[in-house]
Structure formats: C-alpha cells, structure tokens
Regions:
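Intrinsically disordered, low-complexity regulatory segments in ankyrin-centric signaling systems
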Residues: 1-41, 138-140
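Conserved ankyrin/ankyrin-like repeat signature
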Residues: 34, 66-67, 99-100, 129-133
C-alpha cells in the first residue's frame, strides 16, 4: 500500500468529504435535530471547513439560534476564529441576528475576540443594543 495515495487520507476520501459537506449544510440550514444525531455519534462540535468556519460560525451567520445553542451544549469553542479572523459572535452581530447574539453571549462568547471583534462590529454598525449586552456579565 502506497502512502503517497491521496485517497488514503481521510481528507481526500470522497465519502468523508460528502459527509462533511452534509454536516456543514445542516448547520447552515439550522437543521438541529439531524445535526444533534451526528454530534451524538461523535462528530466534533468544532468541525471546521476549508475556510476555517466552524459549525457554530455557519449556524450563527445564518441566524439559527437553536442550532447555535445545540453546539454550545456540545462544547463548541465559541471564540474560534475563521481564516478571516472572525468569530461567530462577530458574524451574528454583522448579520443582525439578535437571538444568536443573545445565545452566544449567554454561553460566554467573548465580544472582543477576533478582528473586527463583535464589539467593534457593533460600534461600526451603530448596534448599541449589542454593546449594552456585551457590557453585562454573561448569564450562565
């Protein structure tokens, strides 16, 4: 068996790529029940795509608060930055996803993580309600 065969690497295995794509789509679409089954089967909550986006980033950016909460419950790193230095909280602030911002904040996401951070994005876009939320200690 040659170790030079790229198809022997799980990253290049077409079945693994297809499964990962499906899981990322579940997060992007907010299909929490189906995603929960994969998480229960051992898929890591911090699964990351080729842009550095975690499942949490995809769910947050697309406004799926229940999916974000599910990922929080499964131990997702809420401050993990993508390849552009963005956090899930900053993505939710940028998109104006109030429910997602609240879930992430309540679970302890750092409003100062990343560049621009969620706090910086809130200031840039005049979202004072987020700045007020970030000033309060997280409710755990």
């Amino acid at each position: 068996v040659s170790t030079d065969d790229p198809t022997s690497d799980p990253v290049h295995d077409p079945e693994v790529v297809t499964l990962a794509t499906k899981i990322f789509q579940l997060a992007r679409r907010g299909e929490s029940e189906a995603l929960a089954a994969y998480l229960a089967a051992g898929v890591p909550a911090d699964l990351t795509n080729d842009n550095g986006d975690t499942l949490t980033m995809l769910a947050a950016y697309h406004g799926h608060a229940a999916t974000v909460a599910l990922l929080c419950e499964h131990g997702a790193d809420l401050d993990r930055l993508n390849d552009r230095g963005q956090s899930p909280l900053a993505g939710a602030v940028f998109k104006g996803e109030d429910a997602v911002v609240r879930v992430l904040t309540e679970h302890g996401a750092d409003p100062h993580a990343g560049a621009p951070s969620a706090a910086e994005a809130a200031r840039m876009f005049g979202k004072d309600q987020y700045l007020d939320l970030f000033a309060d200690p997280p409710q755990r």
